[in-house]
């Protein structure tokens, strides 16, 4: 593992986290739209080797009809699930995910920078302010550390 203060933060980060909530706020402090629907689910894994994997399923997803579903159902399934993997670096209170593979090809080779806060066994990731539907917003994702199975 890494040494020093950064090493201690990486040690706190390493593991698997389950998504607890996702919310957004406008630059005026108003509640924004639910970024992943009302009851999203997801997992986030950081390894000691500097790898990250993220999976987020929007709330309210419907099962496909039949074996593979209709074209419309497939499009909706794609729109409501995000998956990516790559490398991460930690610098101060920021974590950067460098995307190597993603369900959204446009994310590949992008850096996603998030402010990071630890609160007991919870991890808060906050996006930089971004223009969404004509309003500047930040998204806050709260993750709960999963304990190792006995």
Task: Walk through the language-model features, giving the residues of each.
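Lipid interaction determinants
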Residues: 2-150
């Amino acid at each position: 593992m890494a040494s020093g203060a950064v090493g201690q933060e990486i040690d706190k980060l390493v593991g698997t986290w389950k998504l607890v909530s996702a919310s957004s706020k406008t630059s005026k402090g108003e509640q924004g739209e639910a970024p992943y629907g009302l009851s999203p689910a997801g997992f986030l894994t950081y390894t000691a080797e500097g790898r990250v994997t993220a999976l987020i399923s929007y709330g309210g997803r419907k099962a496909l009809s039949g074996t593979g579903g209709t074209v419309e159902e497939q499009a909706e399934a794609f729109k409501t699930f995000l998956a990516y993997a790559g490398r991460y670096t930690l610098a101060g209170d920021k974590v950067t995910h460098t995307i190597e593979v993603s369900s959204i090809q446009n994310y590949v080779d992008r850096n996603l920078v998030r402010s990071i806060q630890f609160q007991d066994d919870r991890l808060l990731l906050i996006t930089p302010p971004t223009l969404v539907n004509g309003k500047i917003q930040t998204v806050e994702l709260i993750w709960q550390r999963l304990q190792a199975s006995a």
